[in-house]
């Protein structure tokens, strides 16, 4: 952070992540109507103007509510399903740049512990907050995070927080694992 401003940080993230968001959304729009089948019941009922609206919202990474779904899977971007994980990555990057980068090792350790509790809550289906009751078929799994419903938001946040905070803590305590020829 000595050589990079917050603006530069955000710019680097956008340059790295956003071209694929746009490309995936445009490809999804081109092939949208070809996906008509029983697994995607809403496709043939979707007017073209709504697809264009979803293209705009998808390219801008504006998540859509369940009521705007055009495929039937309640995704935040019906044209580019995997962007749900990038949405969480964008949120993590924003929080990191504005706040989390200032956390001490102790504060990061506390957040790791809290995030671990959320992870355990989902993994063992403890359901501390009463959000997992509707997930009978997906109980004891981390399937979810791609929709703007309370249970999906909880799963998405949990999937983000633990690995994010553990990675930051490991980086701060210089306990990085070196793997010979791990990346070329």
Feature roles, as predicted:
Residues 1-21, 74-84, 148-152:
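Alpha-helical transmembrane segments and their immediate interhelical/interface regions
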Residues 2-38, 42-57, 92-93, 159, ...:
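Transmembrane alpha-helical segments and their boundary/interface "anchor" motifs
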Residues 50-184:
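Aromatic-enriched alpha-helical transmembrane segments of multi-pass intramembrane proteins
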